[in-house]
Each structure stands twice: as structure tokens, then as C-alpha cells.
Amino acid sequence: MAEEEHVDFEGGEAGASLTFPMQCSALRKNGHVVIKGRPCKIVDMSTSKTGKHGHAKVHIVALDIFNGRKYEDMSPSTHNMDVPVVKRDEYQLVNIDDGYLNLMTTDGTTKDDVRLPEGELGNEIEEGFDEGRDLIITVVSAMGEETALACRDAPSS
């Protein structure tokens, strides 16, 4: 008898792809796309007319969702481009420990692998935590990376 292989389907991302293909002509402003291997949010799109030899081209300007860097790409409208699977989750801030956020989901599980962001958002999170405010942190994840994107005060109960 052959040994049965045990596959764990409990996790929501068991074997799930980090991206999916989409035709350039179907991409939209404020949507997401992968440019030069980075997950980006589309901020501007334009289409050039069909030339004498070839297809209409789509010019995409997008910002990296993690570092804000600007990327541009030009591709025939009939070609496929990768679109990242982008997930946004909200967590309650429990603690800040050694540059990392200790977060808790609504069902009580903890998450402590999100780095405290640098700059204005990081300062806002630290100040709010030091003042003893209950903060809700929005975490965005795509293509194996994740970062804190925003924070707000938790609704008082």
C-alpha cells in the first residue's frame, strides 16, 4: 500500500498563490498589479492607440504598497500581468516590544511579527500606546510581506 500524504487545509492560504493573472485591459486605477516583482497600487493608467504593427499599449503608473516607491510599466493591452492577492486586517494593539507590534485579533489570537513602522505612523502608534489609548492597527499583506498601514482609536464599548 502506498503511504497517504497528509495535507493541511486548515490554514486559509494552504497552497494559495500569491498572485493571479489579469489582462492589462481589465486593470483599473486604484487596483493592484505586480511591477518589477513588487506589489503596487495603480495611480494612473493610459492607453495608446493601436499602431501600424501591433496592439494598443497600456501605460501604468503605480506605487509600491509597502514603501511608496513609484514604478511604471508599458505592456500590450492583450497581455496578462500578475495581480497580487492583497489582504487587509485590523488588529488591536496589545504591546510594543523591541520594535515589533504585539497585536490581537477579534478571536483572541495574537500576532507579534509586524514591525513598528518608521516615520510619522510609527510615532503616532508609539505616542498613542504611551498615552494608554486603545488602538486598532490596519495591517496589509501581499506576496509574503506585511506592514502596518494605519492606526485609529478603538471604538469605546
From Swiss-Prot:
Pfam families cross-referenced by the UniProt entry: eIF-5a, IF5A-like_N
Annotated InterPro entries: IF5A-like, IF5A-like_N, NA-bd_OB-fold, Rib_uL2_dom2, Trans_elong_IF5A_hypusine_site, Transl_elong_IF5A_C, Translation_prot_SH3-like_sf
Annotated Gene3D superfamilies: 2.30.30.30, Nucleic acid-binding proteins (2.40.50.140)
Keyword Protein biosynthesis: yes
Localization, UniProt: Cytoplasm
SUPFAM superfamilies per UniProt: Nucleic acid-binding proteins (SSF50249), Translation proteins SH3-like domain (SSF50104)
Major subcellular site: cytoplasm
Modified positions (Phosphothreonine) in chain numbering: 78
Modified residues (Phosphoserine): 75, 77
The UniProt record lists the keyword Iron-sulfur: no
GO molecular function: ribosome binding; RNA binding; translation elongation factor activity; translation termination factor activity
Regions that span the bilayer: none
Keywords in alphabetical order: Cytoplasm, Elongation factor, Hypusine, Phosphoprotein, Protein biosynthesis, RNA-binding
Entry GO CC: cytosol; nucleolus; nucleus; protein-containing complex
Any single GO BP term: cytoplasmic translational elongation
The record's account of how the chain is modified after translation: Lys-52 undergoes hypusination, a unique post-translational modification that consists in the addition of a butylamino group from spermidine to lysine side chain, leading to the formation of the unusual amino acid hypusine. eIF-5As are the only known proteins to undergo this modification, which is essential for their function.
Modified residue annotations for Hypusine: 52
Anything else known: There are two genes for eIF-5A in S.pombe.
Function per UniProt: Translation factor that promotes translation elongation and termination, particularly upon ribosome stalling at specific amino acid sequence contexts. Binds between the exit (E) and peptidyl (P) site of the ribosome and promotes rescue of stalled ribosome: specifically required for efficient translation of polyproline-containing peptides as well as other motifs that stall the ribosome. Acts as a ribosome quality control (RQC) cofactor by joining the RQC complex to facilitate peptidyl transfer during CAT tailing step.
Family stated for the protein in its record: Belongs to the eIF-5A family.
Name of the protein in its database record: Eukaryotic translation initiation factor 5A-1
